[in-house]
Amino acid sequence: MEKQILAAGGIIIDESSDSRRVLLVHRPQYDDWTFPKGKLDRGETVEEAAVREVREETGLKCRIIRKLAEARYLSRKRHKGPLIPKVVHYFLMERSSRRIKVPGDEVDLALWVDLNEASQKLTYAQDKKLLDLL
């Protein structure tokens, strides 16, 4: 039995327009809006996983600026079974590519949202708390 689920994700800020925007993704399986994130692959660091997950879910090449926070909550593996502690390591990132390309299965939409409006769009309280760190 797994003791905890380890995951990592990225919070990408765009400051190229008049307002600061953050990138959110929609996952049809959960019908939620969140930050790009996912579980670590075997042998992968949290930093490597965060960069990989952002690229897989958004198509963006990004680099880590700094670690932002760890979010801890209970989750089910694949919607079934007992609740397991989950730890998500979040990193502030900047993009080195501009074209967003979502895979369509895990993520079907990626949207730049004004930082002041992101809390209204985000589904989970633990994600909304991360906005205070930006």
Regions found by a protein language model. Give the residues of each.
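Residue-level signal for short segments within beta-strands and strand-turn junctions
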Residues: I12-D14, H26, E94-R95
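NUDIX/MutT-family hydrolases
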Residues: Y90, E94, R99-D132
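Conserved Nudix-box catalytic region and its N-terminal flanking loop in Nudix hydrolases
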Residues: D18-K61
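Conserved N-terminal beta-strand and adjoining loop/helix that marks the start
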Residues: M1-R21
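Short aromatic/basic micro-patch
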Residues: T34, P85, W112
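Active-site segment of metal-dependent pyrophosphate-handling enzymes
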Residues: G59-R98
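A residue-level structural signature of the nucleotidyltransferase/glycosyltransferase Rossmann-like core
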Residues: K3-I5, D32, A110-L111
